[in-house]
From Swiss-Prot:
Upper classification of the organism: Bacteria, Pseudomonadati, Pseudomonadota, Alphaproteobacteria, Hyphomicrobiales
Subcellular location, record wording: Cytoplasm
UniProt key word Plastid: no
Function: Required for maturation of urease via the functional incorporation of the urease nickel metallocenter.
Claim: Cytoplasm is one of the keywords in the record: yes
GO CC annotation: cytoplasm
Keywords noted in UniProt: Chaperone, Cytoplasm, Nickel insertion
Protein's name according to its UniProt entry: Urease accessory protein UreD
Coiled-coil region(s): none
Organism domain of life: Bacteria
Family label: Belongs to the UreD family.
InterPro entries to which the protein is assigned, alphabetical: UreD (IPR002669)
Length: 273
């Protein structure tokens, strides 16, 4: 008897979630909601005119070959806060690259706050993340992306791997902001450079696009005193970059800055759980 071995493709996590909102009777309401695979969207009750969306990866993390796609469309006059249920963990990849793509559209007078909790990269993880945003001329947008190179309290380090983070932010079709971050191969050696992270293992980028950018700048800079970071504003755009020794230290700086850029509103409640 001849036994023929067949190659089995490893099971991969895939998901797609889509949320579109409209303004109805002065409140932000669901217009479309779609969930597929490991992607879930939950909408907690709110007590104002805004909508809070919590996106969930039911696979519990990502590894090479996994793919998640999210899209959010905020209709004219709506306000949506989008966050994650927990930190997204990117595990060691035996083959392939995990991909996460997020597309956001904000209509006239709309505001979208993209506030995922931290992404945790483990040693030999591989992730390519894309954020594509299209804003109306009068829309506001806030994005926060924080990354941890392992969990310092657990003794974890990231010596090698791949992390690509690509942002393209457009207003009325014209490009107003682009990010192209890449860590590959010797992650520990690269992040140790003074011009990169100076040996810190937690870092974040924040972008606010809206009419209050320059008005927020002074308050943001006062919060960054003594921290490894900086803020700049020009026109209707404010950018903040931060680095810290660990995730806890980063959060202590990050949360007050986010609150300023939300005009005093706190971070979503799931951040405190």
């Amino acid at each position: 008897m001849t036994i023929v071995a067949t190659a089995t493709r490893p099971q991969r996590a895939e998901g797609r979630g889509h949320l579109a909102a409209k303004l109805l009777d002065g409140r932000t309401r669901i217009r479309e909601l779609y969930q597929e695979g490991a992607a879930k969207i939950r909408l907690p009750n709110t007590f104002d005119a805004s909508m809070e969306a919590v996106i969930i990866n039911t696979a519990g993390g990502l590894t090479g070959g996994d793919r998640m796609d999210w899209s959010v469309v905020a209709g004219a006059g709506t306000k949506i806060d989008v966050t994650t249920q927990a930190c997204e963990k990117i595990y060691k990849a035996s083959a392939g690259v995990a991909e996460v793509t997020t597309r956001i559209e904000a209509g006239a007078g709309a505001r979208v706050d993209w506030l995922p909790q931290e992404t945790i990269l483990f040693d030999r993880a591989a992730l390519f993340r894309r954020l594509d945003v299209d804003l109306d001329e009068s829309a506001e947008f806030l994005a926060v992306e924080a990354v941890l190179l392992g969990r310092k309290a657990m003794g974890e380090t990231v010596d090698t791997g791949l992390f690509r983070d690509r942002w393209r932010i457009r207003r009325s079709g014209r490009l107003i902001h682009a990010e192209e971050l890449r860590f590959s191969e010797g992650v520990a050696a690269l992040s140790a450079r003074q011009a990169v992270l100076g040996g810190q293992v937690a870092f974040a980028t924040l972008l606010y696009a809206g009419p209050l950018a320059e008005a927020y700048l002074g308050r943001v800079r006062s919060l960054l005193e003594g921290a490894m970071g900086g803020a700049s504003a020009w026109g209707d755009k404010l950018v903040v970059r931060l680095a810290a020794a660990d995730g806890f230290t980063l959060r202590k700086i990050l949360i007050p800055v986010i609150s300023v850029l939300r005009n005093g509103a706190p971070v979503p409640k799931v951040w405190n759980l």
